């Protein structure tokens, strides 16, 4: 076997459809576009969402809600991720970055209660969920809001 003699498996390749190349091809003359009409013209197609002049759906439906300009983007940390730290250690932004739990501080760090914590840890973060506070204190740890 040589590289120049390798052929694809039978039936694995298909000839592409060459349109507008004569009547004998079966796709000549109108080139699969039918007769006349907007879609038969060059560049002729309606834009997405166009409904023939009728008021389109995206304009019939009302606008809703808004995007708050002052929304904070917290780096989220779950309690189950903090199990990698030893008991009694102080966990702050620097420790979380070094361990790879978060990739950046952004607008702050928020600790969420997903999973369980079994070690007593001192956690320094900007925000804590109510259930995360309960779980940390129940495990004998302490919380410091920055």
Swiss-Prot record:
GO BP term, example: translation
| GO cellular component terms given for this protein | cytosolic large ribosomal subunit
Database matches in InterPro entries: Ribosomal_uL15 (IPR030878), Ribosomal_uL15/eL18 (IPR021131), Ribosomal_uL15/eL18_sf (IPR036227), Ribosomal_uL15_bac-type (IPR005749), Ribosomal_uL15_CS (IPR001196)
Q: Which superkingdom heads the taxonomic lineage of this protein's source?
A: Bacteria
**Region Disordered, residue ranges:** 1-64
The molecular function terms in GO held by this entry are: rRNA binding; structural constituent of ribosome
* The keyword Ligase appears for this protein: no
Coiled-coil parts of chain: none
Query: Where along the chain is composition biased (Basic residues)?
Result: 30-39
Keywords, comma-separated and alphabetical: Ribonucleoprotein, Ribosomal protein, RNA-binding, rRNA-binding
* Entry-linked SUPFAM superfamilies: Ribosomal proteins L15p and L18e
Note the subunit structure. Part of the 50S ribosomal subunit.
Protein family (similarity comment)? Belongs to the universal ribosomal protein uL15 family.
Q: What does this protein do?
A: Binds to the 23S rRNA.
Designated name of the protein: Large ribosomal subunit protein uL15
Organism in which the protein naturally occurs = Citrifermentans bemidjiense (strain ATCC BAA-1014 / DSM 16622 / JCM 12645 / Bem)
């Amino acid at each position: 076997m040589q590289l120049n003699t390798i052929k694809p498996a039978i039936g694995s390749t298909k000839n592409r459809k060459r349109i507008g190349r004569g009547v004998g091809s079966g796709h000549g003359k109108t080139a699969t576009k039918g007769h006349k009409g907007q879609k038969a013209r060059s560049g002729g197609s309606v834009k997405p969402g166009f409904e023939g002049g009728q008021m389109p759906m995206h304009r019939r439906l009302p606008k809703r809600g808004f995007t708050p300009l002052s929304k904070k983007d917290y780096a989220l940390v779950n309690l189950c991720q903090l199990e990698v730290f030893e008991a009694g250690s102080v966990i702050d932004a620097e420790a979380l970055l070094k361990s790879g739990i978060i990739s950046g501080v952004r607008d702050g760090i928020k600790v969420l209660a997903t999973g369980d914590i079994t070690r007593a840890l001192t956690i320094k973060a900007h925000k804590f969920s109510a259930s995360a506070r309960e779980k940390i204190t129940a495990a004998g740890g302490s919380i410091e809001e920055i």
